[in-house]
Amino acid sequence: MNVSQSAFVTREKITLKCVGIVTKPDSPEAAQFSKQLSCWLHDRDIATGINDIEEHMDLIIALGGDGTLLHIAELATKYSIPVLGVNFGSLGFLAEVNKDDTFESIEKIIAEETIIENRQMIRSRVLSKNSSSGYRFALNEVVITKNALDRLLHLSTKVNDQLLTDYRADGLIFSTPTGSTAYNLSAGGPLVYPGLATILVTPICPFMLSSRPLILPAEKLIKTKFKARDNKEAAQVLVDGQSLWKMHNGDELEIETAGHALKLIVSDSHNYFSILRNKLHWGVEDKRDK
């Protein structure tokens, strides 16, 4: 797979003729705001589509948290449509625009060049003895995991057809730098600056304490073979939190960097390290200790 060498940060003049608005499910606030936003755009002769992503759209506005943005990342990347995340959730690593700043942010997009961070995506598929699944794309991570009551998984993992190791663990997380602040971090993996081209491999509760997270170059092809103890044992594969496939004995999960990146719109004042401090409470004294 040829890894795209495009710059992490680019500037682009976006002409808005049609905008897709995607709302957080079961959020009356986001649904109501989408109507207000749609009217505002119509007043400026800009067509809109609600909760529908089409190839001809010039911009997608995700009204929700990071989960909403993850939900639309695959299609947005496929059609190379820039995404603006408006935070209606709680964390907001990716959806950094506040609701009250939405209209001002769109006016800047209309009037000026837009700053875009090209966020690396990874793609995955499951290879069985006589077939293979189609590719699916992730902005955060692909996870192979066991069922709650099952024993540890035996996962024989290769990098560019060279044996890495045989993991015995509850599962493995294959993460992008963007996803390093998500499940990877909870499992003890490292934080990685989103502009670096890497794939992170992080074991989940490994049997051997010497099994540690690993950072690989983005151009590496990773294959993990599931070695089940019997025909009843199975593993689950989740792509950005969505359960997609079940793996059986001898099946392989293939992971590699996707050929295209997600175009994530950021503000002039965007500061990755400030986001880490604020969201992870770095250097903030815990008032509960007083």
UniProtKB/Swiss-Prot annotation:
The active site is at residue 66. NAD(+) binds at residues 66-67, 71, 140-141, 151, 168, 170, 181-186, 242. Coiled coil: none annotated. GO terms for biological process: NAD metabolic process; NADP biosynthetic process. Keywords: ATP-binding, Cytoplasm, Kinase, NAD, NADP, Nucleotide-binding, Transferase. It comes from the Bacteria. Its main location: cytoplasm. The keyword NAD applies. It catalyses: NAD(+) + ATP = ADP + NADP(+) + H(+). It is found in: Cytoplasm. It holds the Pfam family NAD_kinase. InterPro entries: ATP-NAD_kinase_N (IPR017438), ATP-NAD_kinase_PpnK-typ_C (IPR017437), NAD/diacylglycerol_kinase_sf (IPR016064), NADK (IPR002504). Its cofactor is a divalent metal cation. The keyword Magnesium does not apply. One of its GO terms (cellular component) is cytoplasm. Its EC number is 2.7.1.23. GO terms for molecular function: ATP binding; metal ion binding; NAD binding; NAD+ kinase activity. HAMAP family: NAD_kinase (MF_00361). Involved in the regulation of the intracellular balance of NAD and NADP, and is a key enzyme in the biosynthesis of NADP. Catalyzes specifically the phosphorylation on 2'-hydroxyl of the adenosine moiety of NAD to yield NADP. Belongs to the NAD kinase family. This is NAD kinase. It comes from Desulfotalea psychrophila (strain LSv54 / DSM 12343).
